Amino acid sequence: MSGFSSRPLSTHLRQPSLAPPQGQSPALLARVNEKKAELENLKELRDLSAAVAAQMEALEQKLSTLSSGTEAIATVLANWHNVLRAISMASAKIPEPKEETEENTVPLPQTLVRIPTEHAPALQAHAEGATEEESGRG
């Protein structure tokens, strides 16, 4: 006689069932339900994490736009001292009236002229180089 069981093979394999078998213990059913709830929570967490990641990417794009805008504002503010200096120089050279012709006229500053600035970086570098040479001599 062989050492194998004479029972049919199908009784040795577990049969998957969609409905819970009648003989399962309540503790096992509670654990299965707990794991199902945990799976649902993990799926919700995954979806929420994906939403947060998308919002962070949008925030990154907005911050890069803000950063480039800040650089532009810094450039404009860095040039204001030149504008104010030009206005101050023009205001300092207000001509004194030679004759008291009209008492109601207000002396105006010198006329300011617009100069194209396409070569401004090269001119500024040249002016800074000349300033450094003069300070090196002194």
From Swiss-Prot:
<comment type="function">
    <text>Component of the DASH complex that connects microtubules with kinetochores and couples microtubule depolymerisation to chromosome movement; it is involved in retrieving kinetochores to the spindle poles before their re-orientation on the spindle in early mitosis and allows microtubule depolymerization to pull chromosomes apart and resist detachment during anaphase.</text>
</comment>
<feature type="region of interest" description="Disordered">
    <location>
        <begin position="1"/>
        <end position="25"/>
    </location>
</feature>
<dbReference type="GO" id="GO:0005737">
    <property type="term" value="C:cytoplasm"/>
</dbReference>
<dbReference type="GO" id="GO:0072686">
    <property type="term" value="C:mitotic spindle"/>
</dbReference>
<comment type="subunit">
    <text>Component of the DASH complex consisting of ASK1, DAD1, DAD2, DAD3, DAD4, DAM1, DUO1, HSK3, SPC19 and SPC34, with a stoichiometry of one copy of each subunit per complex. Multiple DASH complexes oligomerize to form a ring that encircles spindle microtubules and organizes the rod-like NDC80 complexes of the outer kinetochore. DASH complex oligomerization strengthens microtubule attachments. On cytoplasmic microtubules, DASH complexes appear to form patches instead of rings.</text>
</comment>
<dbReference type="Pfam" id="PF08654">
    <property type="entry name" value="DASH_Dad2"/>
</dbReference>
<keyword id="KW-0159">Chromosome partition</keyword>
<dbReference type="GO" id="GO:0042729">
    <property type="term" value="C:DASH complex"/>
</dbReference>
<keyword id="KW-0539">Nucleus</keyword>
<keyword id="KW-0963">Cytoplasm</keyword>
<dbReference type="GO" id="GO:1990976">
    <property type="term" value="P:protein transport along microtubule to mitotic spindle pole body"/>
</dbReference>
<dbReference type="GO" id="GO:0008608">
    <property type="term" value="P:attachment of spindle microtubules to kinetochore"/>
</dbReference>
<keyword id="KW-0498">Mitosis</keyword>
<dbReference type="GO" id="GO:0000776">
    <property type="term" value="C:kinetochore"/>
</dbReference>
<dbReference type="GO" id="GO:1990023">
    <property type="term" value="C:mitotic spindle midzone"/>
</dbReference>
<keyword id="KW-0206">Cytoskeleton</keyword>
<dbReference type="GO" id="GO:0051301">
    <property type="term" value="P:cell division"/>
</dbReference>
<keyword id="KW-0132">Cell division</keyword>
<keyword id="KW-0131">Cell cycle</keyword>
<feature type="region of interest" description="Disordered">
    <location>
        <begin position="116"/>
        <end position="138"/>
    </location>
</feature>
<dbReference type="GO" id="GO:0044732">
    <property type="term" value="C:mitotic spindle pole body"/>
</dbReference>
<dbReference type="GO" id="GO:0005874">
    <property type="term" value="C:microtubule"/>
</dbReference>
<keyword id="KW-0493">Microtubule</keyword>
<dbReference type="InterPro" id="IPR013963">
    <property type="entry name" value="DASH_Dad2"/>
</dbReference>
<dbReference type="GO" id="GO:1990758">
    <property type="term" value="P:mitotic sister chromatid biorientation"/>
</dbReference>
<keyword id="KW-0137">Centromere</keyword>
<keyword id="KW-0995">Kinetochore</keyword>
<dbReference type="GO" id="GO:0051315">
    <property type="term" value="P:attachment of mitotic spindle microtubules to kinetochore"/>
</dbReference>
<feature type="compositionally biased region" description="Polar residues">
    <location>
        <begin position="1"/>
        <end position="14"/>
    </location>
</feature>
<comment type="similarity">
    <text>Belongs to the DASH complex DAD2 family.</text>
</comment>
<protein>
    <recommendedName>
        <fullName>DASH complex subunit DAD2</fullName>
    </recommendedName>
</protein>
<keyword id="KW-0158">Chromosome</keyword>
